[in-house]
Amino acid sequence: MAGNFWQSSHYLQWILDKQDLLKERQKDLKFLSEEEYWKLQIFFTNVIQALGEHLKLRQQVIATATVYFKRFYARYSLKSIDPVLMAPTCVFLASKVEEFGVVSNTRLIAAATSVLKTRFSYAFPKEFPYRMNHILECEFYLLELMDCCLIVYHPYRPLLQYVQDMGQEDMLLPLAWRIVNDTYRTDLCLLYPPFMIALACLHVACVVQQKDARQWFAELSVDMEKILEIIRVILKLYEQWKNFDERKEMATILSKMPKPKPPPNSEGEQGPNGSQNSSYSQS
């Protein structure tokens, strides 16, 4: 796995520099505080997770969809394409790439409609406004942005190998696995190789379970400073998440979120490259 990763587009093109990521985000931070942007990340990851669970997708498919979502908004403002449209588009594409099988058009739209109505009605009082033609057009922009670099490496496999090597599978794996799932609510998947994220999650799990693994970690030939950077992000996530009341806060945050500009003529909704939808904006 490791050898393949270092030659992959994931490593060569999609491990980003933190300063570049923050620079790209400045357009959105004119409208949102950093904390509100973090909360948006948590929220839309929850939306993708709920969509995936509704469609009975494997966790790896959901994780890949989340990475696609984050990659798009690492390069473009939130106002370029409505995240409410991008979320199911990423799920649709990830289900094909991860060879889960194509989710049918009808099931996808029904799932998005149901999930927003039943799980997130406090944030989205209206019906899911998009149809399959919007999803397919959005998929085109997503593929273009990622330059068809669709294979994503995740921390799950290295985590399993590390826990087996440590000999503490039953004790540590369930908790460490959940922590890996939670890291997708941060930028970590854009900034660090998956094996480092796996080690950081395992380290946190060891601390929580009071497992002394100092000797095991000391024998690794890995940059522990980077592992500690990742751990700090994980702890910050839990601190913010603990104080985040989605039901009370999300409607206000979504109202502040920059949105695609409505077309000058609502009859002929003209988006980028002549697309006929007001959910797209090039600015």
From Swiss-Prot:
Ranges where the record places region Disordered: 252-283
Tissue-specificity statement: Highest levels in pancreas. High levels in heart, liver, skeletal muscle and kidney. Low levels in brain.
Every Cyclin N-terminal domain range: 46-144
Modified-residue entries (Phosphoserine), positions: 275
Locations listed in the record: Nucleus
UniProt KW S-adenosyl-L-methionine keyword: no
GO MF entries: cyclin-dependent protein serine/threonine kinase regulator activity; identical protein binding
Main location group: nucleus
GO process terms (BP): G0 to G1 transition; negative regulation of Notch signaling pathway; positive regulation of transcription by RNA polymerase II
Endpoints of the signal sequence: none
Record's GO cellular component terms: CKM complex; cyclin-dependent protein kinase holoenzyme complex; mediator complex; nucleoplasm; nucleus
Listed Pfam families: Cyclin_C_2, Cyclin_N
Organism domain of life: Eukaryota
Keywords, in A-Z order: Activator, Cyclin, Nucleus, Phosphoprotein, Repressor, Transcription, Transcription regulation
Polar residues bias locations: 272-283
SUPFAM superfamilies, A to Z: Cyclin-like
UniProt subunit comment: Component of the Mediator complex, which is composed of MED1, MED4, MED6, MED7, MED8, MED9, MED10, MED11, MED12, MED13, MED13L, MED14, MED15, MED16, MED17, MED18, MED19, MED20, MED21, MED22, MED23, MED24, MED25, MED26, MED27, MED29, MED30, MED31, CCNC, CDK8 and CDC2L6/CDK11. The MED12, MED13, CCNC and CDK8 subunits form a distinct module termed the CDK8 module. Mediator containing the CDK8 module is less active than Mediator lacking this module in supporting transcriptional activation.
Role, per record: Component of the Mediator complex, a coactivator involved in regulated gene transcription of nearly all RNA polymerase II-dependent genes. Mediator functions as a bridge to convey information from gene-specific regulatory proteins to the basal RNA polymerase II transcription machinery. Mediator is recruited to promoters by direct interactions with regulatory proteins and serves as a scaffold for the assembly of a functional preinitiation complex with RNA polymerase II and the general transcription factors.
Family: Belongs to the cyclin family. Cyclin C subfamily.
Full protein name: Cyclin-C
Species assigned in the record: Homo sapiens
Organism placement in taxonomy: Eukaryota, Metazoa, Chordata, Craniata, Vertebrata
